[in-house]
Regions:
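Conserved alpha/beta cores of soluble small-molecule-handling proteins
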Residues: 1-185, 189-190, 218, 228-303
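Glycine- and Gly-Pro-enriched alpha-helical subdomains that act as flexible
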Residues: 184-185, 192-214, 219
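Secondary-structure junction motif
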Residues: 222-223
């Protein structure tokens, strides 16, 4: 069987050969900016937006891009096309980009050349396994607030998407002690809700969608799609500080994220949200997303 390709530092290579040296700053320091895009009908969805956000993250992290935005879009499109040819047409791909800040000469035990010192850039794909999200799409996520708090934007700006996620690992470990199938929803130091592990968190109340402010959440590409669809459906979208009080008293809640688009949340810390079932506003948004994607996003995952 032909092996999928990866892009690493200017070359398309077999994915099994895509390796980083142990002295790469992505490994030593966790100094890595990243993005994830997915396909619909094996075509990348909102690729340009993901690449644009990655370059904003690189700029803020003081990591010099080694290609232009346009070049990375072209590289990514070619990579997806190469690897999609190896799969059945009904299989979708996740596309990962990451760029590290380069190498640590001390750990390399030698002087690094100018070429070796450049930031690492990698892109790779994988078949999306929707079974991870199927039960949540049918019945809704259980979100749990662990003791770990969201990193304040004064320390790391939440608008930057990065790989230093030890706090999420610890948070998820705590959450899974409560419910192995739950996902973490972090509070900030003031007790405001922020975001989930890998997803934005949204509420529906009195006919409007309510979101935490952009002060301490990632401005998700999928969240942007929800805003667009809400505008199209004449649903008000409001940003404000929200607390657990607002979650338990919401009519509905949902998560937005690249792999699944929009997925209901029906429980928080063991309490039902609304009537404990996926709600009508989520359904309207999912139907509109399906129209945009050209396929039934709920059936693709839940069936």
């Amino acid at each position: 069987m032909q092996e999928p390709q990866a892009y690493l530092n200017g070359e398309f290579i077999p994915v099994s050969e895509a390796k980083l040296p142990i002295y790469d700053k992505g490994i030593v320091l966790g100094a890595t900016v990243t993005e994830m895009t997915r396909t619909y009908h094996q075509i990348p969805f909102r690729l340009e937006a993901h690449v644009r956000r990655m370059f904003c993250s690189l700029r803020h992290a003081s990591i010099e891009p080694v290609v232009s935005e346009e070049e990375l879009v072209e590289i990514s499109t070619e990579l997806v096309a190469k690897n999609a040819r190896l799969l059945p047409t009904d299989v979708e791909l996740g596309l990962i980009h990451f760029s590290t800040a380069g190498k640590v000469p001390l750990y390399a035990c030698r002087t690094l050349s100018e070429e070796e010192s450049k930031p690492t850039l990698c892109a790779h794909t994988f078949p999306l396994d929707f079974s991870y999200y199927a039960d949540a799409m049918r019945h809704g996520y259980h979100v749990v607030t662990p003791s770990i708090r969201h990193i304040p934007p004064q320390c790391l700006d939440s608008k930057m998407k990065y790989r230093s996620r030890l706090h999420w690992h610890i948070a998820d470990s705590q959450t899974q002690l409560v419910d192995p199938d739950a996902t973490s929803l972090l509070l900030d130091l003031q007790g405001n809700i922020t975001e989930c592990s890998g997803a934005n968190f949204l509420l529906a109340k009195d006919g409007a969608i309510h979101s935490p402010t952009l002060r301490n959440i990632l401005p998700g590409i999928s969240r942007d799609v929800v805003i667009e669809l809400a505008c199209k459906l004449s649903i008000p979208f409001k940003e404000q500080d929200l607390q657990l009080y607002d979650v338990v008293n919401a009519d509905e809640a949902f998560l937005s994220s690249t792999p699944f688009g929009i997925c209901p949340a029906t429980k928080v810390n063991g309490k039902l949200i609304g009537d404990g079932r996926p709600g009508s506003m989520w359904r309207r948004l999912a139907d509109a997303w399906s129209e945009l994607a050209g396929l039934d996003i709920v059936a693709q995952i839940a069936d």
